[in-house]
């Protein structure tokens, strides 16, 4: 099994990169987000690799971090999510954004990924709710927000508030942290408009 490759970029295609490692060219399929962050041909690159072996083929998938690779594996535990859809999800959402979407049960954000219909989006946020790995840093905002939600806070206004703040240009982690702080400072039980207003105050500090 191949776990990691370090070499020189030989070619970048629409959904793959060819990495030259000591004269051997390895084709690794990547998310568009990963491909965009790689350098140009001739530059050095390191990829974390997930190796798929089938009866008729061997395919490599490349990631810039071990965290992204773990999410690739985790997403495919959901029925209806294969490697293509998993890469589409990782193109549309960062691992941190995925964590927040799952914590908030935000199926709308998940459904933005190509190939992810409403039913699959519901399965992803439902089935991974208790399975998503609690990686340090990437999961902090979602875990904090989940703790602030508790049992008595409606998820819909919270999700709407986070979405509204991201539409204003804030990152999903910033928005989630702001809404979590808003809940803590008197926003619990309020509607999305109140949470947005309090969230903006938190972001302005």
UniProtKB/Swiss-Prot annotation:
Q: Where is this region: Domain I?
A: 1-64
Q: What InterPro entries would the database entry show?
A: DNA_helicase_Holl-junc_RuvA_I (IPR013849), NA-bd_OB-fold (IPR012340), RuvA (IPR000085), RuvA_2-like (IPR010994), RuvA_C (IPR011114), RuvA_C_sf (IPR036267)
What SUPFAM superfamilies does the annotation carry? Answer: DNA helicase RuvA subunit, C-terminal domain, Nucleic acid-binding proteins, RuvA domain 2-like
What ranges does the record give for the region Flexible linker, renumbered to this chain?
144-153
- Name the segments for region: Domain II: 65-143
> Which GO-annotated molecular functions does the record name?
ATP binding; four-way junction DNA binding; four-way junction helicase activity
- Which Gene Ontology CC terms are recorded? cytoplasm; Holliday junction helicase complex; Holliday junction resolvase complex
Q: Where in the cell is it found?
A: Cytoplasm
Give GO BP annotations, semicolon-separated: DNA recombination; DNA repair
Q: Which UniProt keywords apply?
A: Cytoplasm, DNA damage, DNA recombination, DNA repair, DNA-binding
For region Domain III, the annotated ranges are 153-205
In Pfam terms, one family for this protein is RuvA_C
Origin: domain of life: Bacteria
HAMAP family per UniProt: DNA_HJ_migration_RuvA
What does the record give as the function of this protein?
The RuvA-RuvB-RuvC complex processes Holliday junction (HJ) DNA during genetic recombination and DNA repair, while the RuvA-RuvB complex plays an important role in the rescue of blocked DNA replication forks via replication fork reversal (RFR). RuvA specifically binds to HJ cruciform DNA, conferring on it an open structure. The RuvB hexamer acts as an ATP-dependent pump, pulling dsDNA into and through the RuvAB complex. HJ branch migration allows RuvC to scan DNA until it finds its consensus sequence, where it cleaves and resolves the cruciform DNA.
Q: What is known of its domains?
A: Has three domains with a flexible linker between the domains II and III and assumes an 'L' shape. Domain III is highly mobile and contacts RuvB.
The family note in this entry says: Belongs to the RuvA family.
Self-association and partners:
Homotetramer. Forms an RuvA(8)-RuvB(12)-Holliday junction (HJ) complex. HJ DNA is sandwiched between 2 RuvA tetramers; dsDNA enters through RuvA and exits via RuvB. An RuvB hexamer assembles on each DNA strand where it exits the tetramer. Each RuvB hexamer is contacted by two RuvA subunits (via domain III) on 2 adjacent RuvB subunits; this complex drives branch migration. In the full resolvosome a probable DNA-RuvA(4)-RuvB(12)-RuvC(2) complex forms which resolves the HJ.
User: This chain belongs to which protein, by name?
Assistant: Holliday junction branch migration complex subunit RuvA
Q: What organism is recorded for this protein? A: Sinorhizobium fredii (strain NBRC 101917 / NGR234)
Give the gene name: ruvA
């Amino acid at each position: 099994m191949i776990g990691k490759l370090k070499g020189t970029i030989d070619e970048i295609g629409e959904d793959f990169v060819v990495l030259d490692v000591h004269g051997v060219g390895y084709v690794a399929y990547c998310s568009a987000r990963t491909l965009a962050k790689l350098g140009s041909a001739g530059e050095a690159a390191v990829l974390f690799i997930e190796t798929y072996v089938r009866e008729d083929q061997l395919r490599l998938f490349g990631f810039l971090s071990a965290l992204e690779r773990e999410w690739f594996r985790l997403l495919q535990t959901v029925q209806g999510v294969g490697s293509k859809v998993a890469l589409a999800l990782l193109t549309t959402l960062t691992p941190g954004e995925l964590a927040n979407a799952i914590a908030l049960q935000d199926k709308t954000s998940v459904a933005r990924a190509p190939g992810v219909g409403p039913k699959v989006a519901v399965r992803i946020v439902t089935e991974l709710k208790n399975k998503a790995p609690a990686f340090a840093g990437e999961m902090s905002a979602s875990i904090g927000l989940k703790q602030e939600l508790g049992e008595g806070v409606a998820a819909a206004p919270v999700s709407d508030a986070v979405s509204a703040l991201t539409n204003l240009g804030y990152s999903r982690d910033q928005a989630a942290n702001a809404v979590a702080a808003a809940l803590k400072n008197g926003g619990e039980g309020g509607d999305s408009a109140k949470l947005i207003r309090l969230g903006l105050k938190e972001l302005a500090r």
